[in-house]
């Protein structure tokens, strides 16, 4: 998702500050045309506060949007660190808006990803906004006949959601394979 956001911003003439903090896969860093900087903020299973301070020091003076890819393996500890250390309020005081992008997937993971979104929305303070990406790759984003917009996870947090992005369900035989190939090769 980070690569898509950064590419979109670049296509609009913006120059976002791109940072990859994923401790397992530095996929975002592989997009050389996006000038992604790699930062190691994890120390084992925990956030290294000194390294995290370096991240904030990069964000603070930025006049452009900042796109950070943190990866699934560090998402829970990073979210916990952000909330317990009141980082969203700090960023807000610096004139920045924290926008958390989260993915809801269809199929078997639907209930888990809905629950994850609801937990994020309840844990993050009011300063944080959310962009929800609906990914139908594994199945439709529906539960018991209700669409995402009808589900409690959304209706209870609707005011916090800045946007909902529907990822198109591309046929693998055509555009789906092309997009997959582009992403694998980290092309922009």
Describe the predicted segments one by one.
Residues 40-44, 64-82:
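Switch II (G3) loop of P-loop NTPases
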Residues 47-56, 82:
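Glycine-rich, highly charged phosphate/nucleotide-binding loops
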Residues 15-16, 36, 66, 98, ...:
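Hydrophobic anchor at the start of a short beta-strand
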Residues 12-26:
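Short beta-strand-centered segment that lines the nucleotide-binding/catalytic pocket of NTP-utilizing
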Residues 74-169, 173-177:
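Conserved catalytic-core segment of NTP-binding enzymes
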Residues 180-188:
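NTP-binding/hydrolysis catalytic cores, primarily Walker-type P-loop NTPases
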Residues 1-5:
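Glycine-rich phosphate-binding P-loop
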Residues 24-41:
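P-loop NTPase switch/communication element
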């Amino acid at each position: 998702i980070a690569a898509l956001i950064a590419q979109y911003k670049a296509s609009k003439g913006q120059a976002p500050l791109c940072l990859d903090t994923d401790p397992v896969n530095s996929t975002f860093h592989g997009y050389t045309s996006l000038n992604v900087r790699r930062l190691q903020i994890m120390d084992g299973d925990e956030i290294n506060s000194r390294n995290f301070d370096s991240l904030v020091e990069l964000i603070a003076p930025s006049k452009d949007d900042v796109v950070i890819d943190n990866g699934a393996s560090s998402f829970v500890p990073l979210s916990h660190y952000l909330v317990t250390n009141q980082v969203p309020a700090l960023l807000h005081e610096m004139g920045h808006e924290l926008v958390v992008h989260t993915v809801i997937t269809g199929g078997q993971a639907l209930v888990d990803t809905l629950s994850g979104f609801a937990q994020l929305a309840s844990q993050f303070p009011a300063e944080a906004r959310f962009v929800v990406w609906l990914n139908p790759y594994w199945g439709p984003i529906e539960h018991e006949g209700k669409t995402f917009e009808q589900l409690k996870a959304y209706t209870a947090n609707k005011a916090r959601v800045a946007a909902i992005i529907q990822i198109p369900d591309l046929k693998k035989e055509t555009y789906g394979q092309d997009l997959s190939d582009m992403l694998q090769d980290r092309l922009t």
